[in-house]
Amino acid sequence: MAQVLNDISNRVLPLFPIRNTVLFPGLVLPILIGRDDSVKNLLRLGNDSENQHTILLTTQKNADDIKPSINSLYKIGVLAKITELVQLPNDNYKILIKVLDRVKLTIRRSHDLLVAEYVIVPDDEINNADEIKDKLANAIVLFNKYIRLSKKINPDLLVHVLSYTNQSYVVNALAANLICNVANKQSLLEITDVKQRIERLTDHVAKEIIIMETDELITSKAQKNLEKMQRDCFLNEKMKIIKNVLGVDDEKSDIAELQKKIDTLHLSKEAKAKAESELKKLKMMNPISAEAALTRNYLDILLGLPWKKEKESKININIDKALQDLNADHHGLEKVKERITEYLAVLQRTKKSIGTILCFIGPPGVGKTSLVKSIAEATKCKYAKFALGGVRDEAEIRGHRKTYIGAMPGKIISLIKRENSNNLVILLDEIDKISRDSRGDPAFALLEVLDPEQNSRFQDNYLEVEYDLSKVLFIATANSFNFPIPLRDRMEIIQIPGYVEGEKLEIAKHHLIPKQIKNNGLKNTEISFSDEAILELIRYYTREAGVRGLERKIGGICRKVLKKILSSKDIKSESVSKENIKDYLGSRKYKYGLAEDDNQVGITIGLAYTETGGDLIWVEAVMIPGKGKVKATGKLGDVMKESSQTAFSYFCSRAQKYNVKYEQYHKYDIHIHFPEGAIPKDGPSAGIAIFTTIVSLMTGIPVKLSVAMTGEITLRGRILPIGGLKEKLMAAKRGGIKTVIIPEGNTSDLEDIPNSIKNDLDIIPLSEADQVLDIALATTVTNSPAETAC
């Protein structure tokens, strides 16, 4: 024992690791000594040592370690004095200590027991006592609130703490009673600057207060909700007892009503079995449970559908009246109206859906939606619209499974339930705007809906039973063919072209102007439009294939005229003319391509089809020294770039015929440009225009700028058919073109072109590229000298 005592000096004392707490100078508290090493360390003090009442204590980082290592102990601890020692019956000891100072420890083991050499670490000198006093007062106020919220700290603590005269001891006492993790408390112990320790303590207390306030708020709300649920449950039970006494039972009445529907509705066998099964479950459920509400909602939807097959004779269509209505509501579109009346005729004769799904494809504003409404009116069927633009979830079509929170049937079933009819016209609007994501592709979900062989057994995920959609007339609309081919294959495509200028004029006179006069509160005698004014609107204030923009402009003029009439007593009416339209709408917004007067070398006029109709497109070319390469610019797509290369390759194969020497096209690069470079351009129909431009450039022969052309060119010089002929010819007429070269393969399309366009143009169908040169160039190419223009 004497040898052990000799190891303990004034600066080396036994070290006692403590768990789950941090000690601060100034505290007086009991400590339980129970671990074997700690008991041995206590006993080694002996009875006669001068250090028997002084020990070192520090916190261990891991509270689960029974025998902590030196590295698992914090190096800042405390020096304490034992004021009382009591041996417990289980050979453990309970000591009462007074913490004296904060110390820095150098820990080691002596005879396998922890000892440490220590250096006292005092607080820094206080420079601004008043500031510290204010900060401490603020900390005490916060801690008082913290005590009220925590409900785990004795409210009398502050009375005891405030009895300290040492500000550092006050901070230490507050920190010791803070309920937080050991690491945060240890950081407070290690701070020697009293001001900084107060600030850190204040931050910790403020954060804990926020956490406790949030927890208290959540607990309060949860308690209120629980009380409300208990109250509702109590009242419901009480109501049940009262109803039983009176002989009234709403729940039984509801179930009886559902059972009656199941018995009387013409449900399919599968649907009836499903309804019976769900009703049986409902009877066994607590009426106020969430599951009961979901089951009742399912039965309401299932039994709310029109299961009874409506009489086939309900379809009664007057074909002549339907055609009259179509003509009254839609100008032009003769082929479209003819196909619609054929469709209606088959419906009238068969008295049932014929399985043909029509799909109207055309630019915005050409009347696709109104055509569908006309079909609904002609068939005397209810009309419903399913907007597919932006739909990206397959569940929008097939519905969600009942296991999902907030599950509902798909839009098709929902529309049928809303209209309560199977004889329904459903417009699938903007079918080309469907998108896809990780939840599936709605476009392919529509395959089952639109397939006549499958839609009689359509199964919505929510219903989980088959439902017959064969009586529903589905009609789709789109702006382009940009949707999956299998879906396109399910439908009959009816293309609706943009309106030509004359058609827009008639639509404006007979539909748009009367509508806007009425909508804006004007009288027919108060405003009038000349034909020239309407044409001015069409040509220079709108650029579209349809008439929506034109209607908006007419509406704008009507509003300004109304304001003018109401603002002046002298003005009773206004006449809108080509000359004064600028006063209402400002300067012209658009300009169309116009033919130039002077023929030029290396410039050809092509014809382009755009979303807003047709337009002239210039093809320019120059030569620069190089290696016989072609460069095409003007924001062109891949197809147009390939068309440029094809035209150049065909020219090279025929260069000798055009009296162009080999050196001329192998020592120069050709730069082909399409002006208005900000506008994207693509497609093969500029092939012959590019070819003509190259020949003109290499031979020096000007191109007639009264001639425009369209057609795809092959490497053999053949001219292939193109699309959008009507719009292109309209653009040629508007631009002052006299002669238009088109592919011979488009000759049959001329039957659909209005005479008002054909009569003003010399339209020449051709099949070979060399034939184009004879018409488009100012002189015959084979007789020209072999000179070039750069």
UniProtKB/Swiss-Prot annotation:
Residues 598-779 form the Lon proteolytic domain. It holds the Pfam family AAA. One of its GO terms (biological process) is cellular response to heat. Its EC number is 3.4.21.53. NCBIfam families: lon. ATP-dependent serine protease that mediates the selective degradation of mutant and abnormal proteins as well as certain short-lived regulatory proteins. Required for cellular homeostasis and for survival from DNA damage and developmental changes induced by stress. Degrades polypeptides processively to yield small peptide fragments that are 5 to 10 amino acids long. Binds to DNA in a double-stranded, site-specific manner. This is Lon protease. It comes from Orientia tsutsugamushi (strain Ikeda) (Rickettsia tsutsugamushi). The gene is lon.
